[in-house]
């Protein structure tokens, strides 16, 4: 069995969901998208009142889709709060380092984004005239 790539911690009715794949700069793999969807479902069913979405490591919040193991089942949109997972609790994204492509979409579907001085947002799809449907 593969080690979890999403962690869920709860304290004082505040959930912290962490993308935990720093060795791959938190690239969004199929496993990660599945676990993230499950974490948001857990949040919805819990007594937690708010969620902080963050990422492990110091180089990237996430570099977007993992090109060697892209999200396919479920698709990337299925882990987006309020789109693929219905939530009535606020999600606060805490961003550091690179935030690229699908990760940028994930941040945009959060209720609030807080970025530190290292944050670098980039949506490469726009450079080639493609929008994956999440931002459009």
Where do the protein language model's features map onto the residues?
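Glycine-rich acyl-CoA binding loop
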Residues: 25, 29, 103
């Amino acid at each position: 069995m593969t080690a979890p790539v999403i962690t869920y911690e709860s304290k004082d009715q505040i959930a912290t969901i962490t993308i935990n794949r720093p060795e791959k700069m938190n690239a969004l793999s199929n496993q990660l998208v599945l676990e993230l969807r499950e974490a948001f479902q857990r949040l919805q069913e819990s007594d937690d009142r708010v969620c902080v979405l963050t990422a492990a490591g110091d180089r990237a919040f996430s570099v977007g889709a993992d090109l060697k193991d892209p999200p396919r089942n479920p698709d990337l949109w299925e882990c987006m709060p309020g789109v693929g997972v219905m939530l009535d609790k606020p999600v606060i994204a805490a961003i550091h380092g690179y935030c690229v492509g699908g990760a940028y979409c994930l941040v945009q579907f959060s209720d609030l984004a807080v970025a530190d001085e290292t944050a670098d947002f980039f949506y490469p799809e726009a450079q080639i005239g493609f929008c994956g449907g999440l931002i459009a």
